[in-house]
Amino acid sequence: FETRERDDRRYGAGSRLTEDRDYFYHYDCEGNLVFKEFRTLDWAGVSVPLGGQKAHLEEELGITFRAFGAGWRYDWQSDGMLSRVIRPDGKEVSFAYDALGRRIRKSFAGTTTHFVWDGNIPLHEWTEEAEENVVTWLFEQDTFVPAAKLVANGECFSIVSDYLGTPMQAYDKQGDKVWEQELDIYGRQRKRPSAF
């Protein structure tokens, strides 16, 4: 909790988060988050369902909206893997997995990113736009903590992580900082990082 009174969020059956200061959370009968609904309309480009659309969406998801019916929609496969996210602006992000449950593809806005794994550690990622855009990730031995990023054009970056293994900074070959993020004590970004 972020307040002394512990009133900044509420939990429901199964200890599921049902609301916080920004969202109402809706779940399906299997406990999967299916909709994260804005409490207020502060997000630019939000698509708000009107009348019949809102009722149809409530029926389809098996939920009852508590505010405007605008927010993030999550669709799940029968095996519990996230298959699709529909953003508040209506744009869709879709995912595909291999037989071991590892994400092998993410598609958004006409770009598809592919992932290759070494056991449970991501090894390569690339987009379909060009062959020379392969990215190789190196991890600390026997951990999930990223240590470096190698790009096909010859760029390489060292990654500095915090004590939990969360990447906090990245440096190029010359030792110049090229990326940084800062988190508050709840893990939210204080300073939004640039793309890395």
Placement of each model-derived feature along the sequence:
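Conserved Rossmann-like nucleotide-cofactor binding loop
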Residues: 1, 16, 30-32, 81, ...
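Short, acidic, Ser/Thr-enriched surface-loop or helix-capping motifs
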Residues: 12, 28, 44-50, 58-60, ...
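A motif-centric feature for acidic-aromatic and gly/ser/thr-rich catalytic loops and repeats
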Residues: 2-12, 153-196
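Surface-exposed extracellular loop regions of Gram-negative outer-membrane beta-barrel proteins
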Residues: 33-38, 45-47, 60-96
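Beta-strand-dense domains in secreted/periplasmic systems and polymorphic toxin scaffolds
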Residues: 2-5, 20, 36-37, 64-65, ...
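Structured, non-catalytic alpha/beta "coupling" segments that mediate domain-domain communication
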Residues: 1-16, 20, 116-123, 128
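Short, small/polar residue-rich loop motifs at catalytic or cofactor-binding pockets
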Residues: 4-5, 19-21, 68-70, 89-91, ...
